[in-house]
């Protein structure tokens, strides 16, 4: 009897974990129109710059690779803010990846932290928020322009490029919805 009860409980538990939300939003849900205006005035230029930077780097290896461990982010309908938060927090995990050029990592972190700031959100892990503190006090003269890292291809870089593309698409979707 006990074993049957035990098995029935633990069959439901994984289902509950799958059905539960990935992360509860830690955003101070602000006025969406204000968020759009802040994005357009403050952040959109940096997002465009980051997309242009990512286009400069080789991506032929990214097109042919299937990423076993990569996270795919979608901009969920009616949950754009939570989607943007999740993407921004995920992008911060690439900040210390040495295989990606320093200037590209810093720009990605700047966009991620800017997104979190505009949305008034926080990441679940405080380590990622420390990156934003580091980025906000960063001296831009310190960045490198490494041609050698442009030639290298690695999974982390491909994942970051996909994340950047998703982030931009989600911001565009958010803008269109709010403009209606």
What are these regions (language model features)?
Residues 26-180:
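Extracellular/luminal segments of secreted precursors and ectodomains of membrane proteins
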Residues 6-24:
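Cleavable N-terminal signal peptides of Sec/SRP-targeted secreted and luminal proteins
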């Amino acid at each position: 009897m006990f074993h049957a009860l035990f098995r029935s409980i633990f069959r439901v538990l994984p289902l509950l974990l799958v059905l539960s939300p990935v992360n509860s939003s830690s955003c101070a849900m602000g006025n969406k129109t204000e968020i759009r205006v802040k994005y357009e005035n403050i952040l959109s230029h940096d997002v465009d710059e980051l997309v242009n930077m990512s286009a400069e780097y080789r991506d032929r290896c990214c097109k042919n690779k299937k990423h076993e461990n990569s996270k795919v982010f979608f901009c969920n309908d009616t949950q754009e803010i939570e989607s943007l938060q999740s993407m921004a927090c995920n992008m911060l995990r690439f900040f210390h990846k040495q295989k990606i050029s320093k200037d590209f990592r810093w720009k990605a972190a700047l966009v991620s932290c800017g997104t979190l700031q505009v949305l008034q959100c926080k990441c679940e892990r405080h380590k990622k928020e420390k990156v934003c503190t580091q980025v906000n006090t960063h001296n831009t003269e310190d960045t490198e322009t490494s041609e050698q890292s442009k030639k290298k291809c690695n999974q982390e870089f491909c994942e970051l490029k996909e994340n950047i593309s998703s982030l931009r698409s989600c911001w565009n979707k958010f803008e269109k919805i709010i403009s209606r």
